[in-house]
Amino acid sequence: MIFSKISQVAHYVPQQLVTNNDLASIMDTSHEWIFSRTGIAERHISRDEMTSDLAIQVADQLLTQSGLKADAIDFIIVATISPDATMPSTAAKVQAAIAATSAFAFDMTAACSGFVFALAMADKLIASGAYQNGMVIGAETLSKLVNWQDRATAVLFGDGAGGVLLEASKDKHVLAETLHTDGARCQSLISGETSLSSPYSIGKKAIATIQMDGRAIFDFAIRDVSKSILTLMAQSDITKDDIDYCLLHQANRRILDKIARKIDVPREKFLENMMRYGNTSAASIPILLSEAVQKGQIRLDGTQKILLSGFGGGLTWGSLIVKI
């Protein structure tokens, strides 16, 4: 049988840093108010780079690190809710920029679960035997979706990208998987609506910026995500002691605290970087993974079991246990 493995990781964030104190100068908030509620102290905001620019930086790094030629890449999946445009896809721009002429490319929209969903799909593509090498990138410029007068949401989000290179392997590395969607709760977190504008349409005001029912999302993350992780471990016969690190979507420090208690995994196994990046949606998990590899916490030698878990708009949530 053919399986997939993560062979390379990379990330990139825009240079411009926006601190909580910077935000306090343009809206009614303070560093203490933001940090005590979220664990976020600063975030990177793009000045002129689009989502594709961030993703291209990651793709270039992955290629360089791997030593592969661009035409050896079979597919590129970009998980994003903030594409440059609805057409062409962000992934198509990445494919062109790195000259991966043999690759097919497409975007995936699953909000903050996007990277996990895309990684699960990429694993199946390689397991089919038809493809050998693929890139999965989470990239966001959420700054263009934020209402900068709304302190409840503007303080949360940042821009950035992270990704992995998947290669075919004779050993199984994706050990367990669970993916979920509950569209009935979709109005809890929305953004980027468009209006009907033909001569035959009745106008409807669209919600362009991010709007969130914070309490509903907080409760969802604690209840549904924790339950699905516990179920996943039970079904796969993987215990909490088997897990080396937990890399969850970086939405809020208090969410991580509560999920750690719910699933009874030591809090120190939960890596975090939201203090420096905020919530970067589909980019948060791969950025966290890339930094952990840089720091030597995760070795990419196939000896560690890592829980990856994303959750967000849709509502969507999903987890993978991978051997890295």
UniProtKB/Swiss-Prot annotation:
GO terms for biological process: fatty acid biosynthetic process. Pathway: Lipid metabolism; fatty acid biosynthesis. This is Beta-ketoacyl-[acyl-carrier-protein] synthase III. It is an enzyme of class 2 (transferase). It is found in: Cytoplasm. Residues 250-254 are annotated as: ACP-binding. GO terms for cellular component: cytoplasm. It holds the Pfam family ACP_syn_III. Belongs to the thiolase-like superfamily. FabH family. InterPro entries: ACP_syn_III_C, ACP_syn_III_N, FabH, Thiolase-like.
